């Protein structure tokens, strides 16, 4: 990990600081702790133009998936700190399942969807897609639909699962088939 005395291999515009958090997986308490640490760091080391980037995988596995989704869907979780939320493979599968893709629904149930549905107050063994849609707030679905694959800061590129070799970044950013997120 770089500290303030090491030279960075990339470049950010003057006054810009990036905070990046990956793979939250429904761990709301830990996310709150990380956000508090960022607030403390900004207080102790002010900077003109900070940004927070969540790198995807907000759902599945952890105990507070619905809470994490509610916090992120509500907008910038730290007042005054612009936030970018990226698409992870778990969000992609969840969204596809909620939009009626039966294969995605099956995959999702075996890769963390059970925990997600339980967090929303459902028994995944007893409920159908229509029940899922009744319990998952529309704001959470719209949040999922609005997630992007990658984000650039200076000459850094942030993505959940990496970059496809041999494909120009601009082509990847505009790529409509989000199922390629791994």
Which residues make up each language-model segment?
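Beta-strand-turn-beta hairpins that frame and shape the catalytic cleft
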Residues: 12-17, 151-157
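Acidic, His/Gly-rich catalytic cores of divalent-metal-dependent hydrolytic chemistry
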Residues: 13, 177-182
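Acidic, glycine-rich loop-and-strand cores that form catalytic or ligand-binding grooves
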Residues: 153-166, 175-177
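N-terminal active-site segment of His-dependent metallophosphoesterases
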Residues: 1-69
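Active-site neighborhood of divalent metal-dependent phosphoester bond hydrolases
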Residues: 48, 61-149, 180
